[in-house]
């Protein structure tokens, strides 16, 4: 198998674009930056300095929990010297990336966004990190997140600059950045870093990608290793990348998996299902932009098939919370012990800072209850057993039947039904959480891959909208190739400007 660095520049990629230098180096995509360093047009130090400066200029976003500038610059200098000495270039050689703070990276604390783990410095990297480091990537910092990954707002009361709580949106600093990979989303969207890793249980890579105007990819569960990642639900969890282009996502995926990318398909060969239920009850800006995107694809020859899954939300609800709430306790307990964190499960829970996350643990996970039904407490263990035995297989079979019956490559829908909401305690409500995950959660519960792409900016609010495609488990290569085609029609995501957003930040 050929290593990505040995391949010729991507078919269809404009060489002039790859080697063109923008006014600011932090405007480069991951692919562009790696090409410029590889061909000695710029140095790794220049790149790292540019993005470190950008990170410092946008501290009000609360995008990072930790940054190690000295170590990053030392690695950059080392790589520059390596190339000067005639070393063979690496696929990501000398290019900075960021990593969500629940994915272990040696040299950084792995807090999972919670105070009890603030002093936990792992002795080994998460397995998904290893191929990226071997490819020459430089981890400059760990990104902020919804505490313990249990939410979609990024309103983390433990890690923030003075006076500004919550990870903030790249396009409007008064709004949320999505979650739980909040910092990874806003860091890429605000051009603080060209790419970042996050984790996705029910939309936690795709939502931050969508609301920050970038691309977020959730692979099939099991495609990327999860060793060394603070868990929620082993059945549903997966790491995934966020970047500014599908090209960058494909590059990262090929490095992590060692697989060569699939050819970009012809429009006429693509069949996308529009599930009615996932297009209902949308906010007007989301509806307009995503319907416009669908029309553009259809005009190019993509086959759009209208389909229905009348019980999609009911089936998903029967799986989603039972799995996350029940699996969390045992998975976290095992993780804390196996990775020698020095913190017990009880100590972890006692230190939770964010009120919404504390409520989840104290009212549901610790007592082993799912809630109430007709005045009676619902036993969590029984709900989990039912979900695994009946509800999840039914959901998976329903997707398989839909794809087979209509000969679909993927389904397509708005990533989130609404624009990013204001960043405040109300953003942590269960109602806000349920609304944010509504469209991305069902396929997550079936272990399916999905990728969110930018569909444009809302006209009045100036906020990004995402459109997502999801395929059956194992269809990642085909899904990424379709995403490449879609991006060629819709264009890449917008770039935020600082003018007009500084005054919006809620202190």
Curated annotation (Swiss-Prot):
The protein's UniProt keywords, in alphabetical order, are:
Hydrolase
List the active-site residues.
Answer: 100, 180, 204
Q: What is the relationship between pH and activity here?
A: Optimum pH is 7.8.
According to the UniProt entry, the coiled-coil residues are none
Q: Does the keyword Transit peptide apply?
A: no
Tell me what reaction this enzyme catalyses: (R)-mandelamide + H2O = (R)-mandelate + NH4(+)
Q: What molecular functions are annotated in GO for this chain?
A: mandelamide amidase activity
- Highest taxon listed in the record's lineage: Bacteria
How its function is modulated: the record gives:
Inhibited by 3,4-dichloroisocoumarin and PMSF.
Q: What is the effect of changing residue 437 to N?
A: More active on the (S)-enantiomers of mandelamide and lactamide than the (R)-enantiomers. More active on the (S)-enantiomers of mandelamide and lactamide than the (R)-enantiomers
Q: What happens on changing residue 316 to N?
A: More active on the (S)-enantiomers of mandelamide and lactamide than the (R)-enantiomers
Gene3D superfamilies assigned: Amidase signature (AS) domain
Q: What class of enzyme is it?
A: hydrolase
Q: What is the effect of changing residue 180 to A?
A: Significantly decreases activity on mandelamide
User: What turns on expression?
Assistant: By growth on R,S-mandelamide, and to a lesser extent mandelate.
EC id:
3.5.1.86
Asked if Hydrolase is a keyword of the record, the answer is: yes
Q: Share what the entry says about its subunit structure, partners included.
A: Monomer.
Q: What does this protein do?
A: Hydrolyzes both the R- and the S-enantiomers of mandelamide, and phenylacetamide. Has lower activity on 3-phenylpropionaide and lactamide. Does not hydrolyze benzamide. Hydrolyzes esters and amides with little steric bulk. Preferentially hydrolyzes aromatic substrates.
**What family does the entry list?**
Belongs to the amidase family.
Identify this protein by name: Mandelamide hydrolase
Task: Give the source species.
Answer: Pseudomonas putida (Arthrobacter siderocapsulatus)
Query: Which lineage do the record's taxonomy fields give for this organism?
Result: Bacteria, Pseudomonadati, Pseudomonadota, Gammaproteobacteria, Pseudomonadales
């Amino acid at each position: 198998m050929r290593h990505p660095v040995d391949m010729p520049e991507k078919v269809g990629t404009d060489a002039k674009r790859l080697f063109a230098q923008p006014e600011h180096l932090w405007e480069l995509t991951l692919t562009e930056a790696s090409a410029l360093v590889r061909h000695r047009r710029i140095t790794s130090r220049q790149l790292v300095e540019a993005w470190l400066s950008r990170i410092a200029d946008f501290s009000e976003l609360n995008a990072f929990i930790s940054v190690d500038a000295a170590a990053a610059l030392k690695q950059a200098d080392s790589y520059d010297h390596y190339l000067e000495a005639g070393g063979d270039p690496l696929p990501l050689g000398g290019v900075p990336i960021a990593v969500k703070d629940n994915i272990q990276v040696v040299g950084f604390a792995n807090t999972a966004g919670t105070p009890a783990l603030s002093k936990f410095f792992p002795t080994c990297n998460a397995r998904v990190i290893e191929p990226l480091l071997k490819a020459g990537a430089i981890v400059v910092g760990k990104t902020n997140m919804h505490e313990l990954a249990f939410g979609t707002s990024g309103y983390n009361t433990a890690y923030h600059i003075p006076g500004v709580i919550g990870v903030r949106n790249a396009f409007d600093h008064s709004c949320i950045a999505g979650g739980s990979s909040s910092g990874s989303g806003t860091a890429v969207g605000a051009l603080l870093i060209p790419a970042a890793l996050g984790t996705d249980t029910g939309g936690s890579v795709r939502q931050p990608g969508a609301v920050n105007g970038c691309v977020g990819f959730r692979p099939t569960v099991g495609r990327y290793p999860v060793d060394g990642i603070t868990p929620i639900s082993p059945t549903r969890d997966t790491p995934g990348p966020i970047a500014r282009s599908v090209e960058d996502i494909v590059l990262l995926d090929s490095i992590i998996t060692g697989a060569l990318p699939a050819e970009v398909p012809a429009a006429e060969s693509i069949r996308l299902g529009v599930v009615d239920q996932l297009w209902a009850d949308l906010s007007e800006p989301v509806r307009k932009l995503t319907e416009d995107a669908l029309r553009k694809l259809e005009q190019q020859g993509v086959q759009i098939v209208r389909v229905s899954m009348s019980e999609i939300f009911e089936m998903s609800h029967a799986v989603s919370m039972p799995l996350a709430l029940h699996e969390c306790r045992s998975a976290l307990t095992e993780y804390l012990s196996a990775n020698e964190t020095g913190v017990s499960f009880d100590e972890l829970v006692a230190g939770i800072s964010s009120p919404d996350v504390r409520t989840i643990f104290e009212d549901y996970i610790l007592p082993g209850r799912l809630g109430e039904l007709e005045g009676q407490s619902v036993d969590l263990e029984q709900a989990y057993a039912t979900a695994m035995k009946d509800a999840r297989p039914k959901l998976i079979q329903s997707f398989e039947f839909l794809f087979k019956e209509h000969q679909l490559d993927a389904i397509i829908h708005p990533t989130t039904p609404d624009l990013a909401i204001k960043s405040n305690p109300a953003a942590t409500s269960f109602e806000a959480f349920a609304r944010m995950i509504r469209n991305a959660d069902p396929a997550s519960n079936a272990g399916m891959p999905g990728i969110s792409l930018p569909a444009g900016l809302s006209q009045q609010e100036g906020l990004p909208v995402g459109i997502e495609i999801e395929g059956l488990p194992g269809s990642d290569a085909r899904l990424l190739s379709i995403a490449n085609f879609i991006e060629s029609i819709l264009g890449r995501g917008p770039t935020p400007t600082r003018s007009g957003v500084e005054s919006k930040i809620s202190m």
